[in-house]
Amino acid sequence: MTRGQFRAFVKETGHRTEPETDGQGAWGYDEDTKKIEGRKPKYSWRSTGFAQTEEHPVVNVTWNDANAFCRWLAQRSKRPIRLPTEAEWEYAARAGSAMRFYSGESPETLVKVGNVADGTAKKKFPDWQTTIAEDGYVFTAPVGQFLPNRLGLHDMLGNVWEWCQDWLGPYGDLSAKDPVRNEENQVRLMRGGGWGKRVPQISSSALRFSGAPPSRDMDVGFRVAFRAD
């Protein structure tokens, strides 16, 4: 979801994100020190330390904040909107492809479909090991700037990690149809990788990360899902 969409939610509901209310703040980039900083009250979804327009993905929101947005949008749109399950997310990311990477067989093809740590980022962070390609974005890119997958979905890899509904656990031994783990008080899954991940770290659509529901970061956002009519 974009900053503009999240701002509309905040304006209508008065919602304040956990980084804004718990006193811990969020992650951000300090232009003076040229460094990424851990949680500080001066950072939130509103202020990340790097330039973002309303078309950039919202970041520094927790799993709880993302679910609050989903409840609001579901009520407003009269649709059962929620965070995607991990199974739904991976199906959407792979888009029916049997290749190692949904963009092709080579990890270098990912620069065409996702905002990853590349030559542009290396100019800002010389110590980073990156690809030589340059996409023009050090941090987040506006939503939809890269090629879509076969389902017409943009940014399924790169740009921001995306919260899923599930909690993190090992895959089962048996096949299952849309499995979901949704118990309370468990670490929650994130999928997709963010702008700071490099090839080959981000090279597989199976890449997983996790965090407690109140976790927040400058490369973590979300998308929503609903059942088609």
Where do the PLM segments sit?
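Short, structured beta-strand segments at or near domain termini in extracellular proteins/domains
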Residues: 218-229
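Catalytic-histidine neighborhood of serine endopeptidases
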Residues: 11
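Functional-site microenvironments in short loops/helix caps that host divalent-cation chemistry
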Residues: 16, 21-209, 218
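Acidic-aromatic/histidine active-site loop/patch
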Residues: 2
